[in-house]
Curated annotation (Swiss-Prot):
Signal peptide (UniProt feature, chain positions): none
Organism: Xenopus laevis
Protein name: Gastrula zinc finger protein XlCGF17.1
Chief site of localization: nucleus
One biological process term in Gene Ontology: regulation of transcription by RNA polymerase II
Keywords of the record: DNA-binding, Metal-binding, Nucleus, Repeat, Transcription, Transcription regulation, Zinc, Zinc-finger
Zinc finger (C2H2-type) stretch: 6-28, 34-56, 62-84, 90-112, 118-140, 146-169, 175-197
Localization annotation: Nucleus
Top-level taxon of the source organism: Eukaryota
Single GO cellular component term: nucleus
SMART domains the UniProt entry points to: ZnF_C2H2
Transmembrane segments: none
Length: 197
């Protein structure tokens, strides 16, 4: 029947198998018994450890039949495949906006609730999602982890590196104006241009 009959006493989440509930409950009590021999990071289940270990080996066994891009796990491949199909099965009940990944919907919902659960330990500024916090934190550390293979220039954000490569090296302009056909290296440049029409 597909009925989820076993629930977690801590948060109420339901499961079909008791083994799934056991693994889930470890996330509450902090019990993580499987550790990575490479970096020491710990996991609640062996399957999660095995997925993590592929980061060290570079193994990406799941490949996209459309474009050949490879992924660490099946879930990432499924999410990626939606970029080809345009499928967006997750929608916001507040505004109707649709998303390809449930995690994107979860972050989007915070724009309605105003929740910003991730805070900077340096300045207390708060963010909707963890990657925005990581990006922001680089303004304090000065870290620029993205370097150009052509000239060696470094950037704090991967998107800045992409725009730099287009401007300085490839001369690629993938964003075109539907009104006049003029092309731009970044979506932000196109947005500014569109205001002139």
């Amino acid at each position: 029947t597909g009925e989820k009959s076993i629930s977690c006493s801590e948060c109420g989440k339901c499961f079909i198998k008791s083994s799934e509930l056991t693994v889930h409950q470890m996330t509450h009590i902090g019990e993580k018994t499987y550790s990575c021999s490479e970096c020491g990071k710990c996991f609640a289940s062996l399957s999660h450890l095995r997925v993590h270990q592929k980061i060290h080996t570079g193994e990406k066994p799941f490949s996209c039949s459309e474009c050949g891009k490879c992924f660490l796990n099946r879930g990432s491949l499924v999410r990626h495949h939606r970029t080809h199909t345009g499928e967006k099965p997750f929608f916001c009940s507040e505004c109707g906006k649709r998303f390809a990944a449930s995690s994107d919907l979860r972050v989007h919902r915070r724009t309605h609730t105003g929740e910003k659960p991730f805070s900077c330990s340096e300045c207390e500024k708060r963010f909707l999602n963890p990657w925005s916090l990581v990006r922001h934190y680089r303004t304090h550390t000065g870290e620029k982890p993205f370097s150009c293979s052509e000239c060696g220039k470094c950037f704090a954000r991967s998107s800045d590196l992409t725009v730099h490569r287009r401007r300085s090296h490839t001369k690629e302009k993938p964003f075109s104006c539907s009104e006049c056909g003029k092309c731009f290296t970044s979506s932000s440049e196109l947005t500014v241009h569109l205001r002139t029409h």
